[in-house]
């Protein structure tokens, strides 16, 4: 029956994990969570009008050397030529995760010398730490070392580092 099939598919989608680039898993999860879809009141035109809200950030400009890092990095792979990596300023990186109530090991962006320009597709909370860098959110200055609420569609623009240091998070 339809309800049983939908529940099985929801369960399968919840348990599916694919590492790497963006997939359509989140899209499918949102379709299967839609009340009209679950009620069976949709037609074949449903997907053409379905509003998908991606949980993503668009990189409008990458900055000089922006990378995704985590803590403590990739340890134990020197034997196959992979250095430990991880955030250069582990303290600032971990502090940002703590302010955001993230696990210490949660991934984040490391910006080197000059920052990126990012558009947020979903409401979120961010925190900037590390070397002080020019930063504005929709044209308004952003403070470092504190959490900042970000609305969907907002643009975070980060410029050059001001003062000591080369890495911001």
What is the meaning of each model-derived region?
Residues 54-169:
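Conserved "landmark" site that anchors the functional core of diverse proteins
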Residues 1-56:
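Catalytic cores of soluble metabolic enzymes centered on carboxylation/carboxyl-transfer
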């Amino acid at each position: 029956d339809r309800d049983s099939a939908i529940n099985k598919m929801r369960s399968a989608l919840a348990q599916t994990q694919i590492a790497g680039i963006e997939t359509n898993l989140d899209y499918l999860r949102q379709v299967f969570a839609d009340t009209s879809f679950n009620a069976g009141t949709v037609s074949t035109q449903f997907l053409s009008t379905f509003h998908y809200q991606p949980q993503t950030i668009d990189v409008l400009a990458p900055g000089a050397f922006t990378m995704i890092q985590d803590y403590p990095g990739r340890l134990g792979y020197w034997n196959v030529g992979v250095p430990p990596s991880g955030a250069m300023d582990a303290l600032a990186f971990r502090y940002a995760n703590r302010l955001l109530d993230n696990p210490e090991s949660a991934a984040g962006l490391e910006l080197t010398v000059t920052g990126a320009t990012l558009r947020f597709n979903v409401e979120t909370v961010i925190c900037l730490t590390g070397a002080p860098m020019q930063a504005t959110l929709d044209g308004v200055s952003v403070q470092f070392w504190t959490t900042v609420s970000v609305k969907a569609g907002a643009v975070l623009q980060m410029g050059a580092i001001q003062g000591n240091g080369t890495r911001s998070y």
